[in-house]
Regions:
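Active-site HxH/HxHxD metal-binding segment of metal-dependent hydrolases
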Residues: 1-80, 85-86
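Catalytic core of the metallo-beta-lactamase
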Residues: 14, 70-133, 139-147
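Divalent-metal (often Zn2+) His-rich catalytic cores of metallo-beta-lactamase-fold enzymes
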Residues: 121, 131, 147-211, 215-250, ...
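Alpha-helical segment of the N-proximal tetratricopeptide repeat
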Residues: 266-301
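TPR/TPR-like (Sel1-like) alpha-helical repeat modules
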Residues: 317-340
Length: 340
């Protein structure tokens, strides 16, 4: 999260020492790891997640959850001049006292909060926004640790949240008033903790990575709080991410351990289902009956088996469109509508 730095400062100002660039420990290493090593693939996937290719409209891109859309401009990076190494580290910058809290393993591998005691302002970085965030981001990144995330919010709550009069973050709007700030911090802490703990509880009972998104439910007490609704992250991909973090992508079924590629297995499915026409007829009926996920299952096989089948592709696009409209998460909506 560094691309806009040259929009507010110059390299010359940094070299002259008139401006400091302050970053958490490990920032440069993680910036390169996340954005360069898999940069091409991540960029392609980001276009899906943020709806880059679809027009802004009620039937297209309406939001990116923690922002209205991707910024377009020149990306730049300036190396930090001050790296925060300790868990908690205090500095005075231009007469302003700041206590930095390193929060590795939360929204990013290298991240930090900041407390301004004179002003009673808590900067929550991207650890607390106006939505549940991503444990797994659909553009691609390392899986985040929901339990560590909840613990870091809890630490911040009892160190700074109990005193704060204003809370700001890198996305969305400020929050004013101590009571409201504590309410939001507790809800965010509890949401990530519940996600981690309940998914692991279900996993230990035998629920797999390919089933968990249909089993995990956010508690009603959290569903009723706006600040932890599923506008960015969602229970669907976040629940799978928790299992992936602890157990990996394999579901324990030998049939999925070294499977055929979809394009190699799909022709047999199409043959066994009676061919393309039979699939199209059944998929249309499923679509018309609102059973979009079932329609997607069989149409996906057809499109892999017959990539030039325009009827199959058009109907699958219609299914994706209807699914996109139904998801609260802007990320999931954008993926389905972009793919359509």
């Amino acid at each position: 999260h560094f691309g806009g730095v040259r929009g507010i400062i110059t390299e010359a100002e940094v070299q002259a020492g008139t401006v400091q660039v302050i970053a958490p420990t490990g920032f440069m290493e993680e910036a390169i790891s996340e954005n360069v090593y898999a940069g091409n693939a991540m960029s392609r996937r980001a276009g899906l997640q943020y709806g880059r290719v679809i027009p802004s409209s009620p039937f297209g891109q309406v939001d990116s959850a923690i922002g209205k859309g991707l910024a377009v401009g020149t990306t730049g990076l300036i190396a930090p001049t001050l790296v925060i190494e300790d868990d908690f580290e205090e500095h005075i910058i231009d007469g302003v006292r700041i206590i930095f809290q390193n929060t590795p393993g939360t929204e990013a591998p290298a991240e930090m909060n900041a407390w301004f005691p004179q002003q009673k302002v808590f900067w929550a970085a991207e650890n607390i926004t106006a939505t549940i965030h991503n444990i797994y981001t659909l553009r691609g990144a390392l899986i985040r640790d929901a339990l560590v995330w909840s613990k870091q919010i809890n630490e911040a709550l009892y160190r700074y949240g109990v005193q704060a009069e204003v809370m700001v973050s890198s996305h969305n709007w400020p929050r004013w008033g101590n009571e409201r700030i504590q309410e939001i911090m507790r809800a965010q802490r509890d949401a990530y903790a519940n996600l981690n703990n309940q998914v692991l509880n279900l996993a230990n009972q035998g629920v797999t990575i390919n089933e968990i998104h249909n089993e995990y439910e956010v508690p009603l007490s959290l569903q009723q709080q706006w600040n932890v609704r599923q506008y960015h992250g969602s229970e669907f991909h976040n629940s799978r991410a928790v299992i992936n973090r602890y157990l990996g992508y394999w579901d324990g079924n030998p049939a999925t351990l070294a499977p055929l590629s979809p394009a190699d297995s799909a022709p047999l499915y199409v043959e066994m289902m009676g061919g393309a026409d039979a699939i199209l007829d059944r998929a249309q009926a499923l679509h018309d009956g609102g059973q979009y996920r079932l329609a997607m299952e069989i149409l996906n096989k057809l499109v892999y088996a017959e990539p030039n089948n325009s009827g199959g592709k058009d109907l699958l696009a219609a299914v994706f469109e209807q699914l996109g409209y139904q998801y609260e998460s802007a990320s999931m909506r954008n993926v389905f509508l972009s793919s359509a």
